[in-house]
Amino acid sequence: MRKIRHDVFETNSSAVHCLVVPKNLLAKSELKIDSNGMINVGFITEDTEYPLMTQYDKLSYLITQIYYKSGCYYRNESMDDDYEFKIIDEYISDYTGANGIKIDYSNEPGINHQAIWDYDHDVDKFVEIYDKNAVLSFVFGPMMVREYMD
């Protein structure tokens, strides 16, 4: 293995590829925690402006994606008992010190599919839900969700 740049490596093997985001690239949480220790998160809507750069917006985007994927949107159900939501809730709560995530269902969720350059109905294509580091990197790292540009 040979080092090219700081925290970047290259091998002559194509068998394994991975991207590692060092913990020092994760920003301190800016998510607001209410008096009950909860992080209140709403859905991304059709009117949301891109790019999504704030931790709140990226978490909202992730929650909205999971809401659609779980089928809760189509059944008009709460997502509080959804397995993937519970995983995200645990990861974010551990990182922030919150007691959990409370979803605000008052806004109609909606993702402007034409505005997002990398939109895919399968949330797992852009963040591995079961990988704590991937979720934390998505929400607290430098990644952003940007709009599509021709």
Where are these regions (language model features)?
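Long, non-globular targeting/processing and low-complexity regions
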Residues: 1-8, 15-150
